[in-house]
Amino acid sequence: MSDLHYRLPHFDWLVKAADDVDIVAVVGDLADVVNAVPHTVQTVVLRKYLGLLAEKAVVLAASGNHDLDGPGEHGEQVAGWLRASGGDNVHVDGTSFDVDGTRFTICPWWDGPLTRQTVADQLAAAAVDRPERWVWLYHSPPAGTVLCHDGRREFPDHDLAAWIEEHGPDLVLCGHIHQAPWVTGGSWHARLGDTWVFNAGKERGPVPAHITIDTDAMTADWFGIYDRELLDL
């Protein structure tokens, strides 16, 4: 799932749902820059939620554009609070995590040429000795898919599309474009070559839009507030 945007009832739901899964993946925009709650306060609360989730499941958390909180050592914006949240059961920006033949690579939202190169280097390093399956967390959806269309305009990430072509991951989890699954001609899933790309979308409701992946049955179950779909992988 992605784009919770500091909607605390959705985080509460996620903590309860974590009882039934092995891994929780949140693909960007945990915080919300237009919320009346100061960003510095939001991140304190969000770190507590990450800790609660980590008591129940492995947590993978990638940053989105709303999560940036200041310049890194290179002068480009990073989600410093999220990087500081990493721990034994919480895997964040810039890391990879291997379990049961699957590698999860968690990419940060990049803000300029230096952080873009950091992502390129991260993916190249993670490609070495890759296991049977490789999954990326990357907030923005790639060019060449319906996942980057909001019904009026496209917001394609050409760099991600190029990296997918170069490395051929099995699955990329994205977000960012909230309306993508529900616009005319839209969807929550797409293919680029042999790579599946998912964007669960974001809508109001007591339960957030989310995707549950069963790696034994090789299925993806999308809950889309008004819709539901099961996909064979």
Model features per residue range: what roles?
Residues 26, 31-52, 147-185:
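Cap/insert and terminal regions of metallo-dependent hydrolase folds
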Residues 6-98:
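Core catalytic region of metal-dependent phosphoesterases/phosphodiesterases
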Residues 96-100, 166, 180-233:
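Binuclear metal-dependent phosphoesterase catalytic core
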